[in-house]
Amino acid sequence: MAGLTAVVPQPGVLLILLLNLLHPAQPGGVPGAVPGGLPGGVPGGVYYPGAGIGGLGGGGGALGPGGKPPKPGAGLLGTFGAGPGGLGGAGPGAGLGAFPAGTFPGAGALVPGGAAGAAAAYKAAAKAGAGLGGVGGVPGGVGVGGVPGGVGVGGVPGGVGVGGVPGGVGGIGGIGGLGVSTGAVVPQVGAGIGAGGKPGKVPGVGLPGVYPGGVLPGTGARFPGVGVLPGVPTGTGVKAKAPGGGGAFAGIPGVGPFGGQQPGVPLGYPIKAPKLPGGYGLPYTNGKLPYGVAGAGGKAGYPTGTGVGSQAAAAAAKAAKYGAGGAGVLPGVGGGGIPGGAGAIPGIGGIAGAGTPAAAAAAKAAAKAAKYGAAGGLVPGGPGVRLPGAGIPGVGGIPGVGGIPGVGGPGIGGPGIVGGPGAVSPAAAAKAAAKAAKYGARGGVGIPTYGVGAGGFPGYGVGAGAGLGGASPAAAAAAAKAAKYGAGGAGALGGLVPGAVPGALPGAVPAVPGAGGVPGAGTPAAAAAAAAAKAAAKAGLGPGVGGVPGGVGVGGIPGGVGVGGVPGGVGPGGVTGIGAGPGGLGGAGSPAAAKSAAKAAAKAQYRAAAGLGAGVPGFGAGAGVPGFGAGAGVPGFGAGAGVPGFGAGAGVPGFGAGAVPGSLAASKAAKYGAAGGLGGPGGLGGPGGLGGPGGLGGAGVPGRVAGAAPPAAAAAAAKAAAKAAQYGLGGAGGLGAGGLGAGGLGAGGLGAGGLGAGGLGAGGLGAGGLGAGGGVSPAAAAKAAKYGAAGLGGVLGARPFPGGGVAARPGFGLSPIYPGGGAGGLGVGGKPPKPYGGALGALGYQGGGCFGKSCGRKRK
């Protein structure tokens, strides 16, 4: 026993020496068997723990792979002492094992239970966390590698032992670990091996391949100083997502052949163009905003980065082709024009809607509509009875056409203008009128050139003829055709002066010789009487005599029983159809005059724009004849007092005081005679008849009626009037407010209170009427006389005749010496009517005893 006790301290001394000499390469070395002599081992000698050389008992050997010593066999216990990691011996405190001071008593192999017990005890100690080869013991012990608090090498925190991981739980102490067997794996620095000898599972540590190099502190084995790109997996079977084709330094910015990843550059295959950022106004975009939103946008066609992009320039160019929509054109039209403006040139009646596309269509439609009959007219008039369709047939409405007293016929008659302020189409009307005038002037109730009896005004007839009242045969026929194109104006004069005072001047006043018949039977226009009668039948104009209201003579003013009277007459053939509507033009112009006037009127349609009142479109504002005065008087004649051109008002331009706008068209028409027609609703003047109190008007009647001017003066006045009429026929009003007499021409008119005591007598044609007055103004009519003066009682074209009466002159001959023969022709204006062949009327002119077809007029 003494030998044993002497040897026991040697391992402790050796351990101390080893602690001073040994320097482990890495902390946490491989736990090895406890070197050193064991009871029964070979003492002394230098050895390396784990090498199995010396210091161990006979059974000591090398460490196995992984640093685990071979498990001691049961047979090693006893003879040679415990094997590596054996249990403590009998010596107190000197035994090798897990429990200091030899927890298990016994000496050497004398462990209770023998070899089997020793093996079981070792196994239990191993599970308990005891190191294999620990030298020290529990805290306070002296063994190496003991539990915390021990002085052994590799102990737990607080221990002085070498090799243990600080803070490790149950780290394996010991001095071993110097020797490295073949195939041994050196674990990386980190947490020590846990209980049971299994390595820790900390990511990035000790797991090569998953995170080469790791992002944790420390250096990697393959990629020193470089971590793994976040989110980029590596390993077998995984395609590298690093740009540039991989390689040892792929993904390292600035290192390797391709450098690091660039924003917007696709990786891998198939390569897809990346989505460019922005689209809402960033500096560089594809230039296309979503949903067509128009905004600042970027510069189309410039990709981001290094030139890799969608190259949207082409797409952007196409998109720009359509661009963002504007605000639209003008509201309501969308590029089609200004919303709803008023039509053409407002106020220009004659030209319907000039300048507008709708006007052309409207004019065309109106022309066609007028062909079959137009609606009622504009100018307010009496409740005249119209022919079916468009008022009185005939166009006469244009100033100048039928303008001269006596030239008018079934012209402008009653309401007939189509619709609104504009005429249907003056062009069509003028054209129709021109053709109508070709066949002859309107006959009718013009101022009688020569009358021999009562009713001398109407026409030229000798005696009380039964011809057409206020309508020439040829004119009626032409008017019937002309009416095809549209209705005439409203409020025209029905036979201006003709029949104005039936029997008053001619016949009634002896100064004017003749009994004056109504144009028709026995008139200079007899040649066309039959044809006219036929035409008038179609046009609604019947032959008649027409009288003054309650009238006495033939061919008088409204209210008469005859045919052809002024509106209000009973018989057909009047101006306004058959009723009491506004009068027509009446009169007995010449064919040539009417033709020329119609031609002039065609031009006038563009200038007859003045005055949009109740008158005919484009003419005066009143109810008068188009282009004439605004009042109810005879167009262009006096405003109150008198017969056209003789009253005190604004007479015919050149005759009276004023000029009516829109009469430019009448300039040429006036060349052949003044315009006819009475105008306003109900006839010539205001309520009660033709003139105002005091008779027909101011001055006397040319033709040696009392107060008449001398021939020279009359000629000069007529000449001047013709030129003056060029500027328009103006003046408002007619014969006066109260008609011819106090109560008209009837019981209170020409009779007791009419032309007699208070009419043509003391206060009528005498002192204040045709007697003392001055008739046609010599000065005003100076130039008009060239073609024939116009005026009531002045006998168209007549000159003063010494001793009374009217001198014969061309167109109104009383004998075969003058064209027209018989009772005179149509030659108003000094032009004889055109011959139709043969020796008609003594010298081959129409009129003068010829009636109907016997006149020899050509038949179309």
Swiss-Prot record:
Alphabetic keyword roster: Disulfide bond, Extracellular matrix, Hydroxylation, Repeat, Secreted, Signal
Listed GO CC annotations: collagen-containing extracellular matrix; elastic fiber; extracellular region; mitochondrion
Modified residues (Allysine): 123, 127, 299, 318, 321, 368, 371, 431, 435, 438, 481, 484, 534, 595, 599, 603, 668, 671, 719, 723, 783, 786
Modified residues (4-hydroxyproline): 35, 72, 105, 217, 230, 233, 253, 346, 399, 405, 498, 519, 617, 626, 644, 653, 661, 702, 832
Signal peptide: 1-27
Subcellular location per the Swiss-Prot or TrEMBL entry: Secreted, Extracellular space, Extracellular matrix
InterPro entries, sorted: Tropoelastin
Hydroxyproline modification, residue list: 84, 383, 410, 415
Example of a GO MF term: extracellular matrix constituent conferring elasticity
Disulfide bridge partners, by residue number: 850-855
Post-translational modification: Elastin is formed through the cross-linking of its soluble precursor tropoelastin. Cross-linking is initiated through the action of lysyl oxidase on exposed lysines to form allysine. Subsequent spontaneous condensation reactions with other allysine or unmodified lysine residues result in various bi-, tri-, and tetrafunctional cross-links. The most abundant cross-links in mature elastin fibers are lysinonorleucine, allysine aldol, desmosine, and isodesmosine. Hydroxylation on proline residues within the sequence motif, GXPG, is most likely to be 4-hydroxy as this fits the requirement for 4-hydroxylation in vertebrates.
Major subcellular location class: secreted
Gene Ontology terms: biological process: aortic valve morphogenesis; extracellular matrix assembly; extracellular matrix organization; outflow tract morphogenesis; regulation of actin filament polymerization; skeletal muscle tissue development; stress fiber assembly
Role summary: Major structural protein of tissues such as aorta and nuchal ligament, which must expand rapidly and recover completely. Molecular determinant of the late arterial morphogenesis, stabilizing arterial structure by regulating proliferation and organization of vascular smooth muscle.
Family of the protein in this entry: Belongs to the elastin family.
Subunit structure: The polymeric elastin chains are cross-linked together into an extensible 3D network. Forms a ternary complex with BGN and MFAP2. Interacts with MFAP2 via divalent cations (calcium > magnesium > manganese) in a dose-dependent and saturating manner. Interacts with FBLN5 and FBN1. Forms a ternary complex with FBN1 and FBLN2 or FBLN5. Interacts with MFAP4 in a Ca (2+)-dependent manner; this interaction promotes ELN self-assembly. Interacts with EFEMP2 with moderate affinity.
Name of protein: Elastin
Lineage summary: Eukaryota, Metazoa, Chordata, Craniata, Vertebrata
Gene: Eln
